[in-house]
Amino acid sequence: MKKTALLNAQLSHCIATLGHTESLTICDAGLPIPLSVERIDLALTAGVPSFLQTLNVVTNEMYVERVVIAEEIKEKNPEILTALLTQLQKLESHQGNQIQVEFVSHETFKKFTLESKAIVRTGECSPYANVILYSGVPF
C-alpha cells in the first residue's frame, strides 16, 4: 500500500504518467466533462471531497508549472479563488518555482479541458471551482 496521501489508484496512475506540459483538470460537481477525456469521479455527496481538499492532495503528488482558471470565479466565488491562490503560493515555495496563473473565460476553459489527460470531478458545489493544472518537471 502507498504511504503518500493519494490513495486513489486511477488518479495516482494519471499523475504518474503525466508528461511535461500535459494537463489535469480538477473540477466542481457541475462542470461538463467531455466523453473524449478520462473521468476520475471522486464525488460522493455535496461537498465531499471538496475542491480544495482534492487540489491539496493532487499538488502534493504533481509538479505544477502553470494553471488556468475561469475568469468568472473572481466575481462568483472569490473565497475559493483566494484559497486557491494561497495554495498555489505555498506550492511555489515548496517546489521552488513560479507558477504561471492564467485567467480565461469559462467557455474557453471548457474548450481547454478537451486537452486534459483526465478531469477529476469533486463533490464541490460552489460556482467556478475549477482549475487546469499543467505538469512541469522538477529538475
From Swiss-Prot:
Purpose of the protein: Catalyzes the interconversion of beta-pyran and beta-furan forms of D-ribose.
Provenance organism: Haemophilus influenzae (strain ATCC 51907 / DSM 11121 / KW20 / Rd)
Family recorded in the similarity comment: Belongs to the RbsD / FucU family. RbsD subfamily.
Protein name: D-ribose pyranase
Reaction(s) catalysed (UniProt annotation): beta-D-ribopyranose = beta-D-ribofuranose
Entry GO CC: cytosol
Keyword field: Carbohydrate metabolism, Cytoplasm, Isomerase
GO biological process: D-ribose catabolic process
SUPFAM superfamilies the record matches: RbsD-like
